[in-house]
Structures are given as C-alpha cells and as structure tokens.
Amino acid sequence: MPKTVITDELYHYCLDKGVREHPALLGLREQTQAQLKNSQMLISPEQGAFLAMIIKLTNASSYLEVGVFTGYSTLWAALALPNKGKIVALDISDEHKTIAESAWNTANVKDKIEYIVAPAKESMQSLIAQGQYFDLVFIDANKSQYLEYYELALQLVPSGGVIMIDNVLMYGQVLENNPSKTYIKTLQKLNNLIKEDPRVDICMLPFGDGITLARKK
C-alpha cells in the first residue's frame, strides 16, 4: 500500500494542526533547546500529546516517570491528569530540577509531583516494597537498564495498567547485527522480550525515536 512520506514540512503541519502545546510546555521546550547541548533528550511535542492522550483515554490518576531531564514529559502528564492525580518522578540527578520546577510552577501543577533523586532501580524497588501502584509508567532513562526497568514496572502497574517506553528504535541502531554499544544490545533484547511476553498486550509506534506501549493483562 502507498505510504505517506513525512517530510519536514508535513511534520510541522502535523504539529501545527494536531498538537496543543500549553504555553508552559512551549517555554520549557524552548528553554531546554536554547540552554542545553543534550536537548535531544526531550520527547517531541507529538510524543507529549500522545502521552497526555493515553492518560486521558485510560482515565489514569497516577503516573510514574523514570527519567525526568528538564521535566517536559512530566509537565505533559501533570496537565493531563485530574486535579487529584499524582506523579512520582524519578531521576538520578537534580541537575535540571530548578528548570523543571519553574515550569511546573508556571503551569500550577507542581503540587501533583513528587520528585525523587536516586538511582531509578532503587527507587522503583522501594515503591514496590511500599505496595504502590501506578496506572501508567513512562520509561525514558538509562537505556542500558531498560530490561530491569521493564520488569520492575510490571510490578508497579495493576492489571490494565500501561507501560510506555521511549527510544525503542534508538535512531535506527536497533537494526545493527552486531552492535558494539551495550545499550543497543539491551534495547534489542527488550524489544524481543516484549514481542513474546505473554504478560502484556503490545504496540510499537515508529514516531519520535520509537515508543512501545505494553498493557499488563
């Protein structure tokens, strides 16, 4: 079947017609891109809109984010959650906490967000020990630990809960036959695991840098 080629012009048309980016989101994205050399770590606006839509479609009220960076995806989630919704945001560093919290304050959603600075695996294990559950878990952190994050996330969502994983295509490097980079090997293993995992329903989407949705049965 014929396929639509997404040119830069068509991509920007999609952003213009299909994404409603809150002023606080736009300001945070532009600030991150202007000030940080690693701004490519941001999710794209359409990924943020997709995340927000998943939250609303599933009526999620609790959200766990593994990897915060400057809080752009966190802000998309916070704006989509109901007023009494809760977010736990995990990051190994507080380097960008000031930028993130400023944007969250601007959007009046900071009270929804608990920011935990520690290795994500430790934090996730602690949340499991506390008996906490989340309607949606978004994984966007150290790619070399994605297998561990996925298994821990499965313990943190109830039946019907959703795990959303970013960067599953890693700029096409997942196609390499013998990758030299450990994190590429990990992503390949993860993608193979999820494809055959009877515990979840799955969908991999080729936008942004690739997103996988896994719904726990």
Spans of model-derived segments:
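A short alpha-helical cap/connector motif
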Residues: 1-136, 143-164, 168-217
